[in-house]
Amino acid sequence: MTTPNFELYGYFRSSCSGRLRIAFHLKSIPYTRHPVNLLKGEQHSDTYKSLNPTNTVPLLVVSNINNTVSPSSASFSIGQSLAALEYLEEALPTNARPLLPPISNPVARAHVRTICNIIACDVQPVTNLKIQKKVKALDGDPTVWSRDLATQGFGAVEKLLELSAGRFCVGDEITLADVCLVPAVWAAERVGMDLARFPITKRVFEEMLKEEAVQKAHWQKQEDTPEDLRA
């Protein structure tokens, strides 16, 4: 069986890119990074648009595979972070650390996915750079906007963690819920959200920060992180 090659196009501060960086490091899967500077508009270049028509990051390009979607192509692109995370779970089920509960536990798997989707669908899209620019153009305060919506979203996450948290979001093993949680907290802290309002979320986040994979994936330690922001 051939080993897929992975190329990740992302931005150091993108929480969606951070999810994939954490997953790759947790699974010890090698990948090639391609920085895309969102502030310089590199996501709108013709070159990048040819790879990802949504002009967003991250983009995961997988090559050296049997491409059943487009058989004439030797590579396959995934332009949504949750889809990419699920792909890694399904494409490498036996030789990489699992980030979903066993298939024999569909309830726990659904709970993990619910937490992921609250973060990915209800929190991140309404607080990202694109929306912040729109809010500012309407004479709103993008920081207040982002902080208020992030606080609402994390309130929902906290309620779910009351049901399931052990050492991590769902029990005592790291799952995709934790992978999504960490970059979301990074983003929320940048707009001044008080994480102390959510004690279970705070505890799980701090537990995740102890993981070497999370430390390697931290936005302050990426090759495209500006020198003045590096840790």
From Swiss-Prot:
DNA repair found in the keyword field: no
CC per GO annotation: mitochondrion
Keyword flag Transferase: yes
Protein keywords: Transferase
Sequence ranges assigned to domain GST N-terminal in this UniProt record: 4-96
Chemical reaction(s) catalysed: RX + glutathione = an S-substituted glutathione + a halide anion + H(+)
Annotated EC: 2.5.1.18
The protein, known as: Probable glutathione S-transferase
